Amino acid sequence: MQRFLILFLLTTACLGAQGQQLDPNDYIYPLRELKQRLYSANFGEIRPGHFHAGVDIKTDAEEGKPVVAAADGYVSRVVLQAGGYGRAVYLTLHNGTTVVYGHLRRFRDDIERHVRRERYERRSNGVNLWFGPGTWPVKQGDVVAYSGDSGSSGGPHLHYEIRDTETQRLYNPVREGIIRPRDEYPPRIVRLHYVEVDTVQGVPVRSVPESYAVVRT
């Protein structure tokens, strides 16, 4: 009975961690005027002190690409800071998720003007502004900003996140099928690493790892 209970708890925990599965048809690609759709960093990559919370989309090594609303919703937050995401826009969508666009060059004109006014009134270089549904509603495809290289960024790109609005749980845009990377090249094995394993305990034993090059004939 105890073993069954443990198995049940583990199973329900795993199922709960999966959460809602998003519908890729609810979203469009967040960038326009690209020569090709490529991304440079994946979800969950190890970063200093944290895991990467989204995907980084290439912008042809250029700034100023139009960033558009992935779905209907409204601009709920605008951030301007020296580090982190730099200039960032948060869109709360009607489908229950929030998308984040980071490292922007500039916001669209009306938002840019509002941010400038707030900076002068607050006498601050950075701002963190929140808005309700009636301030800046957006339709799918509306331009909200332009891509850039602001904040803690190593080159022009768009940082793209999807979160559950209520819980702030992160979704992997690639696993959810919202960002579809091109994968035209089969994997190629170039080396094999050999480590002896205890056949009873299933753990590596104290042996010197061996490495072998794979040669195609």
Predicted regions and their residues:
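Sec-dependent N-terminal signal peptides
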Residues: 4-13
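Residue-level signal for short segments within beta-strands and strand-turn junctions
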Residues: 93, 162-164
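Aromatic/His-enriched, Gly/Pro-containing loop or helix-boundary segments
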Residues: 102-140
